[in-house]
Amino acid sequence: SLTGKAGLSGTSVTLNGTLGLSGTGEKSIQSLSGSGTLALNGGTLSVTSASARNGSFSGTLDGEGRIDVSGSGNQVMQTGSSTYDLGVHGGGTLVLKGTSAAPALDYRNVAVGSAGTLRIEAIGHDAGDSNTSLNVGSIDFQSGSTTEFVYNLSASDPFGSAMLTADSITIGNGAGFSLANMEGNTGLGTYDNLDGVVLMTADTIDGLTEGESMSVGTSGLFAVYYKDATMSREGNHIVLNATVQQDNIFTPAVNSHNSGAGSELLWEAKNNLDATSQLGQAMHSISTMITGD
């Protein structure tokens, strides 16, 4: 427990016991890992680094507080608390990822600021792994922010429920959104157009009027299977719409007879690929390099 003028500055923390921060000293670290207990006692912990740092915390958030992520780091939170706030901005990446025991994460307020990336990521890539469900009081997607929804396309019903539920959602002008899949996903099997798939839901939505839509970026298998992805407001829901990709997207890269045959083989097999097969591995490698509008 650090009280008085004691504090933390410029270190990576692996927390497997209990850390209480209640003093007036600086509370700034490069990354947070472990499965212990963090008690901020109403204060703010800054997670920031000028170099690439990765942290993953799955412990307990005790009391009240705020965690603020910035810089070049990648901070994963596999736990939550309805009395904690989150912020990400200034180059930082915040990954919210549930577990099989707790696929839903709760937070009080979340702010995704300029040059910050929020990633809501499924708990895994296997058939029995669900998407992460984020529940918050409020979330503010500010101008210049990026939010990525990472689905497990191996799940039996990957689009069956919203990935974000909030009391209020604010979408700033210039906020960006994108869709991605988990590494290890190799296909969707049978699939149709995405038509009114609920992505987010809230009692109050500001920044997106009824019926208004905005484009959503795609990467990986979403770019393979779909085109013209958008999200629009329908009442208290923000829903996804996208059209099935009919044309072989690998064709523009063909520069020989062999590569042409390979592109046709991969395209025709895209609905039923074993992750351990050579085609499955090829699809994984190629799809991770694909982005779409």
Indicate where each model-derived feature is located.
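Glycine-centered positions in the ABC transporter ATPase nucleotide-binding domain
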Residues: S1, G17-L19, G43, G73, ...
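Short loop/beta submotifs within extracellular cysteine-rich repeat domains
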Residues: L2, G7-L8, S22, Q75-Q78, ...
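Tandem-repeat/low-complexity and Cys-motif detector
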Residues: T11, G36-A39, G59-D62, T83-D85, ...
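Short, exposed beta-strand/loop patches in secreted or surface proteins that constitute
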Residues: S12, T37-L38, L86, V110-A111, ...
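GD-rich hexapeptide-repeat beta-solenoids
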Residues: L21-G59, G73
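Extracellular beta-strand/loop-rich repeat segments of large surface/secreted proteins
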Residues: S46-R53, G63-G71, T79, T83-D85, ...
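Outer-membrane translocation/initiation segment of Type V secreted surface proteins
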Residues: S178-D293
